């Protein structure tokens, strides 16, 4: 009887593992998806026994190191809760700007919704559509300035008839510069897009679209409350430091993920039509991070380097003075 109740107790205290947090969309510049939840202590006592080490127990839920989740969890609905598509092809937010420059109409539906054979998420549904009408020749240029993620941007779009029933649109979207609030955060991105469309007869339409969005972004990291308090900066970023007098970020995201879409529309009868969409997306995503072996961690906000660890007054004064040798990555010493 005792072994039976012992097994029952173990079963009740053991739960199946499930991911409670999901990284934000890849376009979100502040996500730090490379960090992982790392428990400081694994117990093997009878009361807090964990039969499978990958599942949480009662003790770990109250004592484990959960700080990385601060950087990968946004408030409100997750970006992935909203679906976006052109036709039946799912779209990432990295292509939204290119779709608008190419002349697509944008329609949004709130909450759970379905339209044109596409089902949205709890965050709503965003649809991009191209009209079947023959487009008129047009030009569009714009210059923008901002203080978050990048400093300046420029957009250009040209639509021209190509003859033989073809029309073409070419667009460029460039963004560059540093964040004016968070040191180390910057963006250098260029999105080039092309679309060619041809109309056969009255209602047959063929379109070819290519979007190439290379980008390099410097991101930020979360930190401990003590680091924010000592520096007096609620946007403190421990990921950067000075190297030969210039700012260098250790967390840089490089992306090159082109998208190609081929669409065909044709009528079958007065009340029926046929639509076919083919897409291909292939590329690389790279995310840099500091690594070390048989050496001290170079991260400046590690708990061993904070004044509270050794009750060091000199270190506290250096942090209060925002000395970059203490508060930032010391590249010159690596």
Residue ranges and their predicted role:
Residues 43, 69, 151-153, 189-191, ...:
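Transmembrane beta-barrel architecture of outer-membrane proteins
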Residues 49-87:
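Extracytoplasmic beta-strand/coil segments of soluble accessory domains associated
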Residues 64-66, 118, 146-150, 184-188, ...:
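Short sequence motifs at beta-strands and strand-loop junctions characteristic
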Residues 73, 83-85, 106, 138-140, ...:
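Residue-level detector of the transmembrane beta-barrel scaffold of outer-membrane proteins
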Residues 77, 112, 142-146, 173-175, ...:
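Outer-membrane beta-barrel pore domains and translocons
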Residues 89, 97-144, 151-153:
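A beta-strand signature from Gram-negative outer-membrane beta-barrel systems
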Residues 146-177, 181-220, 252, 260-269:
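Transmembrane beta-barrel wall of Gram-negative outer-membrane proteins
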Residues 197, 205-263, 288-334:
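Acidic/polar loop-and-plug regions of large Gram-negative outer-membrane beta-barrel proteins
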């Amino acid at each position: 009887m005792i072994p039976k109740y012992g097994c029952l107790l173990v079963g009740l205290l053991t739960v199946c593992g499930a991911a409670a947090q999901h990284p934000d969309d890849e376009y979100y510049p502040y996500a730090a998806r490379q960090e992982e939840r790392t428990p400081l202590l694994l117990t093997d006592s009878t009361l807090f026994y964990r039969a499978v080490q990958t599942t949480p127990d009662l003790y770990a839920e109250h004592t484990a190191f959960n700080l990385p989740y601060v950087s990968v969890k946004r408030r409100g609905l997750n970006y992935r809760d909203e679906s976006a598509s052109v036709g039946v092809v799912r779209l990432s937010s990295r292509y939204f700007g290119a779709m608008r420059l190419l002349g697509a109409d944008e329609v949004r539906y709130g909450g759970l919704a379905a339209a044109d054979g596409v089902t949205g998420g709890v965050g709503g549904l965003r649809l991009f559509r191209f009209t079947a009408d023959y487009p008129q020749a047009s030009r569009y240029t714009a210059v923008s300035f901002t203080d978050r993620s990048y400093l300046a941007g420029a957009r250009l779009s040209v639509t021209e008839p190509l003859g033989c029933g073809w029309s073409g649109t070419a667009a460029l979207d460039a963004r560059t510069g540093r964040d004016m609030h968070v040191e180390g955060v910057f963006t250098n991105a260029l999105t080039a897009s092309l679309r060619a469309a041809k109309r056969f007869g009255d209602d047959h339409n063929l379109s070819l679209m290519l979007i190439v969005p290379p980008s390099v972004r410097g991101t930020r990291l979360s930190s401990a409350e003590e680091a924010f308090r000592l520096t007096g900066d609620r946007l403190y970023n421990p990921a950067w430091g000075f190297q030969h007098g210039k700012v260098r970020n250790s967390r840089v995201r490089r992306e090159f993920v082109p998208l190609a879409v081929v669409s065909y529309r044709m009528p079958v009868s007065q009340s029926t039509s046929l639509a076919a969409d083919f897409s291909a997306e292939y590329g690389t995503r790279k995310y840099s991070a500091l690594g070390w072996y048989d050496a001290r961690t170079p991260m400046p906000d590690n708990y061993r380097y904070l004044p509270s660890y050794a009750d060091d007054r000199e270190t506290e004064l250096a942090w209060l003075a925002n000395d970059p040798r203490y508060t930032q990555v010391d590249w010159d010493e690596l």
